[in-house]
Regions:
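Mid-core helix/loop region of P-loop NTP-binding domains shared across ATPases and GTPases
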Residues: 3, 13-133, 141-173
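Short beta-to-alpha linker loops that shape the active-site pocket of alpha/beta-hydrolase fold enzymes
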Residues: 10
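Walker A/P-loop
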Residues: 1-7
Length: 174
């Protein structure tokens, strides 16, 4: 069996400390721990036991992973990449998502070697792709005839010209 978990590492009070990140993952696995107060080693022990109880492959997606290392350093990644040595009945697989293509270059060599990284680089969206995304989003978000003709096209063009970032286009549409 496979269980997928998603954590946005840019969110405050979710991934701004190692303790909070592990506590959030524990919460995603169905158990609550106090938001502060326990020694980090004890939080990790709870985490290990809980993972092993799952008896499955856990796919942990860390969005904005570069923000995680920027806030905490790369010790957290080192610990997460070595966790499978502690587990007997489960496995943890990490997927990191980042817009910063060079953040890996600044990691400690021990962390880099344990990542077993495989990079997938997605090119920026073009104006037509962004336009398609915005049309679908606007159909769900707005009542009919609220978005004036040409607005989606203009937002798409601006966003594609800047960086091809769909999030920026959605912000413009708002």
């Amino acid at each position: 069996p496979l269980k997928a978990m998603y954590i946005n590492c840019k969110l405050k009070r979710v991934a701004d400390t190692e303790y909070r990140l592990i506590a959030q993952i524990i919460k995603e696995l169905g158990q609550e721990i106090p938001p502060t107060g326990l020694p980090t080693d004890e939080v990790y022990n709870i985490f290990y036991k809980l993972l092993d109880q799952q008896k499955q492959l856990i796919l942990l997606v860390l969005d904005e992973i570069d923000q995680l290392t920027k806030k905490m350093g790369d010790d957290i990644l080192y610990n997460l990449t070595r966790i499978n040595t502690e587990l007997k009945k489960a496995q943890l697989c990490l997927i990191g998502i980042s817009n910063n293509l060079i953040f890996v270059e600044n990691l400690d060599p021990r962390v880099k070697s344990s990542l077993s990284e495989e990079e997938l680089i997605f090119p920026p969206y073009n104006a037509l792709q962004i336009q398609d995304i915005l049309k679908k989003r606007s159909e769900r978000a707005f009542s009919p005839n609220v978005v004036q003709p040409g607005v989606i096209e203009k937002c798409s063009a601006y966003s594609a010209r800047d960086h091809g970032d769909a999030r920026r286009a959605i912000d413009l549409l708002r």
